[in-house]
Amino acid sequence: MRFFVLGAGSWGTVFAQILHENGEEVVLWARRKEIVDLINVSHTSPYVEESKITVRATNDLEEIKKEDILVIAIPVQYIREHLLRLPVKPSMVLNLSKGIEIKTGKRVSEIVEEILGCPYAVLSGPSHAEEVAKKLPTAVTLAGENSKELQKRISTEYFRVYTCEDVVGVEIAGALKNVIAIAAGILDGFGGWDNAKAALETRGIYEIARFGMFFGADQKTFMGLAGIGDLMVTCNSRYSRNRRFGELIARGFNPLKLLESSNQVVEGAFTVKAVMKIAKENKIDMPISEEVYRVVYEGKPPLQSMRDLMRRSLKDEFWAS
């Protein structure tokens, strides 16, 4: 089965190149023709510096075949409209995107089930495209159908794939870590509050796990690569858009204007909208996410949010909110 990669941003392009170098047949779809031409003619991409891209690119969705494995690598808020445009139903879907659809509160697996109803798997973990492109050691988690077969086809000497059975946990961990990373970036913008950042990341994984377990996720998923692994890299890496977004907020930039002017999607800023709606409907305590929402959408001063988190009622540590 051929891989049809939907999305030629940094991660979609790098992942397509992994597959191609593994001997797989791959087609990479890009929305813009100029990106397609760069990849096909110059073998370069504006999203992947200093790497030769040797996959074939197209901007024609009609090229997808029903035998293909569709790899989703576009922002979550645009997945539905692209799936509805597909001329055929693919043999299965492998999702690389991280987030929750705002208007429905659905995870990507639920969107795929609703529209395509085909086998589904999700790949997640600490995997910034910039490092994978340089073939630096990376390990990720794959959950879902046909995971053992996909594990063999995707893994390389530098890209190690583990499997698990918890699709819900892997999806939720990947989505919510972006929200916590915005808060981590705010602390970075304050000038390196190491104690506070360690506490934030620790309490953040509890918050993510609490949300996920409400929907049936396995607690141990959040202690693995898809959970604490991805959270750590997103909260600390210079490549993290969500962390950088929070850092700029702390330095005085208007968050809504930042979102308008950004040429890359800050997924956590959209995910937090969906998370807070779901949390309120189900009475799930999400104190960090709530403060991120207030800073981004209600104009609350970030320093005040940090203070309010510290002033919450005292609790036991383990699995307390």
From Swiss-Prot:
Provide the binding site for NADPH: S10, W11, R31, R32, Y47, K98, A129, R241, V265, E267
What's its top-level EC category? oxidoreductase
Q: In which pathway does it act?
A: Membrane lipid metabolism; glycerophospholipid metabolism
Catalytic center at which residues? K177
Q: List where the protein spans the membrane.
A: none
What positions does the entry give for sn-glycerol 3-phosphate binding?
A: K98, G125, S127, K177, D230, S240, R241, N242
Please provide the record's keywords in A-Z order: Cytoplasm, Lipid biosynthesis, Lipid metabolism, NAD, NADP, Nucleotide-binding, Oxidoreductase, Phospholipid biosynthesis, Phospholipid metabolism
**EC number(s)?**
1.1.1.94
Location in the cell reads: Cytoplasm
Kindly give the InterPro entries that the UniProt entry links to this protein: 6-PGluconate_DH-like_C_sf (IPR008927), 6PGD_dom2 (IPR013328), G3P_DH_NAD-dep (IPR006168), G3P_DH_NAD-dep_C (IPR006109), G3P_DH_NAD-dep_N (IPR011128), NAD(P)-bd_dom_sf (IPR036291)
Q: Which GO terms describe its biological process?
A: carbohydrate metabolic process; glycerol-3-phosphate biosynthetic process; glycerol-3-phosphate catabolic process; glycerophospholipid metabolic process; phospholipid biosynthetic process
Q: What superkingdom does the record give? A: Bacteria
One GO cellular-component annotation of the UniProt record comes to:
cytosol
Q: Which family does this protein fall into?
A: Belongs to the NAD-dependent glycerol-3-phosphate dehydrogenase family.
The protein's role, per its UniProt record: Catalyzes the reduction of the glycolytic intermediate dihydroxyacetone phosphate (DHAP) to sn-glycerol 3-phosphate (G3P), the key precursor for phospholipid synthesis.
What protein does this entry describe?
Answer: Glycerol-3-phosphate dehydrogenase [NAD(P)+]
Its source organism is: Thermotoga sp. (strain RQ2)
